[in-house]
């Protein structure tokens, strides 16, 4: 989590893919997290959530982009989705993951999720969900545009969306364009330590930097555009 410093006493996670599930557990051990300090469930996060009734201080994810899911109408009665009036489409589960994560986020917690740019502008049900999150709840805290070809298996550009339920800066949203902040590698692009530090400091200070970041204040006109 690059946006805040916290003391983590216990880690919870859920991953459907067996290989990624095992890699996640190995990653914990390689970073000196004792097996008694984490619980990672191997199941479908959307269809069979593992930690009902829990709330978490920090929620982070890099879910599969625009994955298919059931979008079963019965989910409209599920507490994770019921307040929105719409479900993410079967062909794109991006907003279903966002809704799932927000449900499990503590009121004073921070959530960060990596998703393709389409979540920022697609319409229909996704537009309804996005409008509810921004206009009704005012949960969106920042959008950080990342370089293309940053993650293994995909070359598409992505964004980090940061959400908070109780925002200190509730009258604005910070936009950071870090799409040109990378070091080109043989097969993938990489964020350098300097790139990461600049993103983190810009987020913490909520600075407007020419051609890099902009803090959008919610005026009456901006509210109409949300």
Question: Can you describe what each PLM-predicted range is?
Answer:
Residues 21:
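Short alpha-helix immediately C-terminal to the canonical SAM-binding loop
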Residues 3-9:
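Conserved S-adenosyl-L-methionine
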Residues 49, 53-220, 226:
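A conserved structural/catalytic subdomain of Rossmann-like adenosyl-cofactor enzymes
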Residues 11-15:
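Conserved SAM-binding motif I beta-strand of class I
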Residues 10, 37-39, 142:
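Conserved beta-strand segments of alpha/beta enzyme cores
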Residues 25-51:
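S-adenosyl-L-methionine
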């Amino acid at each position: 989590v690059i946006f805040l410093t916290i003391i983590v006493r216990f880690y919870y996670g859920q991953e459907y893919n067996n290989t990624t599930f095992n890699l996640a557990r190995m990653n914990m051990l390689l970073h000196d997290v004792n097996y008694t300090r984490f619980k990672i469930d191997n199941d479908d996060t959307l269809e069979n959530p593992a930690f009902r009734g829990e709330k978490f201080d920090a929620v982070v994810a890099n879910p599969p982009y625009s994955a298919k899911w059931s979008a079963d109408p019965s989910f409209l009665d599920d507490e994770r989705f019921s307040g929105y009036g719409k479900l993410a489409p079967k062909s794109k589960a991006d907003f279903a993951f966002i809704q799932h994560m927000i449900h499990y986020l503590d009121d004073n917690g921070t959530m960060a999720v990596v998703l393709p740019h389409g979540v920022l502008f697609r319409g229909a049900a996704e537009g309804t969900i996005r409008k509810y999150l921004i206009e009704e709840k005012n949960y969106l805290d920042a959008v950080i545009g990342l370089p293309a070809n940053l993650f293994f298996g995909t070359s598409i550009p992505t964004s980090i969306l940061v959400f908070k339920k109780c925002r200190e800066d509730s009258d604005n949203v910070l936009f950071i364009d870090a799409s040109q902040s990378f070091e080109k590698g043989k097969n993938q692009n990489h964020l350098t330590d300097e790139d990461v530090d600049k993103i983190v400091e810009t987020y913490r200070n909520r600075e407007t930097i020419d051609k890099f970041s902009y803090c959008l204040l919610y005026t009456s006109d901006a509210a109409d555009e949300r």
